[in-house]
Amino acid sequence: MFAHEFNHFPPSLSNSGEMNYPSNKASLIHEILTDCHNAPDEPSEFDPTSAVLIDGGRLLHQFPPRPLMTFRQYAEMLSKGPISLYLQHHQRMDIVFDTYIDGSLNAATRQGRGKGLRQRVAAETKCPAKWSQFLKDTRNKKELNIFLAQQLTTYSYPEGRQFFATCEEKVLSNTSFTMADSDQEGADTRLMLHAKHCLSEGLNRIKILIDDTDVIVIALGIFHKLQSSYHFDDIVIEFGINKNHRSVSLKALANSLGPSRCLAIPLLHTLSGSESTSALKGIGKKKAYEALKAYKESEAILGDYFSNAFKTLNEGDSAFKTIQRLVILMYARTSILESIDDLRMELYFQRSQNIELIPPTSNALYLHTLRCIYQAGVWSLCLLPFQNRPSPCEYGWQKTNHTSMYQPVWITKGEAIKECREFVKCSCKSEICTRCKCKNAILRCTLLCSCKCDDRVSFD
């Protein structure tokens, strides 16, 4: 019975059928930084032949418009303020915005972030007072990103400096230098594409300013590939503001972790919860990372599925058995079990029969792993302008007739209440039951019962 979920969605992965997003997905980075003492917190100063890349979302949140500003005045403020300041110290600056595509997988995962205030963007229209609410509406952000990219590339900057801004699939510039179009939707992956372009142009030190620590996870996964193709001093990633500001040398961090663990971290991150994958309830990033360190054999499997984007995984594969074992160690560090379904029964009795605190079934975990492999595959191909991604429907997602949005396929095995004739257990203290819930329901006792009946039904 424990090979079946108790409902049509797994409580360990979902909230009443909705994705259970992690409350603090950045904590994985903090665990990694704590573990790697050789990674300096503050890098040395950049030389004048460096580049700075910034996530457009960070720019918009860090530098909101002043009261009563029009959108044109806001663009001028950004140009004369932070952009000009960055270009005084760097040869090149790139702003990378998200692209918003209706009906995409990213569009489905953005639904959980709340709805904002709709306002059209035009040069002489005043910016809204409730800026954070304005930025919650993807239609607003799409129009704003296009407007800013077009405006910012028309202004004058220090002589000889290069400025690039993404505008949907295109990349605009203030110079004759060009970059290839790209169908990458997220700024987190497209920043890596721009970093690669900087390195190919001979810039040897890059600073990346981010709003989302997923960028560090992605960068670790592809760092050694970049290092084998280009000669450069370092890539430094900055995140957080004020007292939470951190500056990380990617080179020092990647060399401290080693190639094998760097490749494993992206898929580990998706397994323990990311923007498009559920978190396991009760299992934070710390437990996930500790399990990876304890079970070193899993590094090669996770790394292989990141390196070989969208690689096929079947439920009976040895690779999935390794992933099962890794998740088992997230829940019970000393367990010797190989089957997560066996662990479900063991933990069910240990944890006061709270089904949210036991792991998903092997079937639900398999479908969750497919969704994780898909997300890791998108990240893995971040150095390609056009990714040629397969359909998410091949990786644990579906589109139903009543919605154009992707929904997770939670289980393909019947739920326990349908597969088992009755979910009844008795609390008898005697050796043999005579009058109890099971007898009244004309059922044999099971291993869930407290009695010691000789004819109890097992769940094999």
Residue ranges and their predicted role:
Residues 1-460:
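Noncatalytic, typically N-terminal accessory segments of nucleic acid-processing enzymes
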